[in-house]
Amino acid sequence: MMDELSEDMAKGNGEALTTYAVVLGVQPQDREHFAAVTHEHFSEIFNKSDATAADVYANTQAILKQDARLAKYAEQA
């Protein structure tokens, strides 16, 4: 799953990326924006070649919190 997600995020679309958005609770109207933002910040989300699911999740949360439209989907810490 991580390989598929990284490939989809790198290109900005795909089934794994859509599934990730759904798991995070991103509503359909915001999924295109989610794909664009995660694509733009790919190197920050997958910041090392051996990134774990926990790394990717934490990095995604950090990116979501920085985006006005997507912040509502970030986990409240």
Model-derived features: where do they sit?
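Mature extracellular/secreted ectodomains of secretory-pathway proteins
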Residues: 1-77
